[in-house]
Amino acid sequence: MQYTKISQSLLKELFNFKVREQCGLKIVAKYFAHLKEEPTPAMQMGNWFEFMATKQLPRDGETPEPDRLKNGDLSAPYRKMEKQLTNYEKIIEQYGIEIEETGYDFKKHPKASGIADIIANWDNEKVIIDIKTTAHIDNRWEKYGWGDEKFENPDSPDAQHLTIQAVQYKLLAKYEWGIENIPFYFFVFSTTDENACKIFKVEVNPDLLEAHDKQIEQAYEFFNYKFIMRSSSDLAIPQMSRCATCFLNKDCTEKINVPIIKTIYV
């Protein structure tokens, strides 16, 4: 049996399962059976932007194609992202960032995985850069919003949902190169405002890195030895709207198309 290493996305999915916001059947399909889920339009745009910036294919190996008009021109949203590519190039040039590798696959951690968008030399330091695209660059309330105020409380679940990637990749870099707390940056680009982009440098408490390593160990044991062994009925967390759009919908025996009855006690 081939065991699954824990990526930061799988770690978040397991947490969502714990709080009943994600179906276990979908997690098994994506991370154990490696079934492909169709990307949303927002994900497609993000994949295209990252491909144009780094020249690295998405994990499905398919070259992203932009939306085009009948005359062959880019659609309006993609024209905004084309302008953002110019902003990205300006950032690289004006900050004197030397890109060493793109799409770097970390291998040396025995139980954790991750693929860095960019490994670079910045001010004579090896750094990790991750590219994000968002329609909510100044929104602190949206799950994928990047409003500055969101990070005033770094321990909040909403902030950690975004920053856990930095924690994971810093840990991976320690195993990979022996670098303690490697500098990590998010480059965030708006999909709605072609002139809006942000750079966040993420500083991580060393104690948190140690705790994260233990969390990876626990998640690895749980996923590989317990989670995937559960029955379909134990894994399923059906929810009407979620089931309706799930890529497993056609053959799933646990799906629902009417709401579950919930009891209110007064």
What are these regions (language model features)?
Residues 101-163:
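Non-catalytic protein-protein interaction segments used by genome-maintenance enzymes to assemble
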Residues 1, 125, 265-266:
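Short intrinsically disordered terminal tails
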Residues 11, 19-21, 134-135, 204-210:
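A short, sequence-level motif marking secondary-structure junctions
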Residues 93-95, 120-128, 173-182:
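Secondary-structure boundary elements
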Residues 1-116, 120:
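Metal-dependent nuclease catalytic cores that hydrolyze phosphodiester bonds in DNA/RNA
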Residues 39, 75, 156-163, 168-266:
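Metal-dependent nuclease catalytic regions and adjoining charged, substrate-binding loops involved
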Residues 53-57, 133-136, 174-178, 224:
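Hydrophobic/aromatic-lined pockets within catalytic cores
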